[in-house]
């Protein structure tokens, strides 16, 4: 039986193509393998849940929201460290996300280094 390496993939879920591409490029520029999805449902339908080490997810998405995705993954016993990003810094939503296990909640626009520090911390989980 082969020993499985710890997953290192950073999955990015954001419906804004510019944000998605920028975050994907940022992750790859520092050596993190990354894959971007436009919708939560696209990520769920992919075969990448098991090798995802960190999720960067927009709170507000068409269809399933970022919080709904977090809830579904928790219900399916996936424990993927999740960093939420949003243009709407609602404290109630922030607390809900953190109580459900999010490792960070960043309000757009955010500093690239703040996001990278959060990703590095998530990969250490």
Regions found by a protein language model. Name each.
Residues 58, 86:
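Active-site residues of response regulator receiver
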Residues 67-78:
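Short amphipathic alpha-helix used as the core "switch/output" element in two-component signaling
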Residues 1-11, 17-18, 24, 39, ...:
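Non-catalytic signal-transmission and effector/linker regions of two-component phosphorelay proteins
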Residues 108:
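A Lys-centered signature of the CheY-like receiver
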Residues 62, 90:
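The feature encodes the CheY-like receiver
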Residues 36-54:
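Acidic, metal-coordinating helix/loop segments flanking the phosphotransfer/catalytic sites
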Residues 38-39, 65-68:
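Acidic catalytic/metal-coordinating carboxylates
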């Amino acid at each position: 039986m082969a020993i499985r390496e710890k997953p290192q993939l950073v999955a990015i879920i954001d419906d804004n193509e510019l944000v998605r591409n920028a975050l994907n490029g940022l992750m790859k520029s520092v050596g993190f393998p990354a894959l971007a999805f436009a919708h939560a449902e696209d990520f769920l339908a992919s075969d990448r849940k098991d090798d995802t080490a960190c999720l960067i997810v927009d709170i507000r998405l068409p269809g399933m929201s970022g919080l709904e995705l977090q809830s579904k993954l928790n219900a399916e016993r996936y424990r993927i460290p999740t960093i939420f990003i949003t243009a709407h810094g609602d404290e109630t939503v922030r607390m809900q996300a953190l109580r459900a296990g999010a490792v960070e909640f960043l309000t757009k626009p955010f500093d690239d280094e703040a996001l990278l520090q959060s990703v590095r911390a998530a990969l250490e989980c």
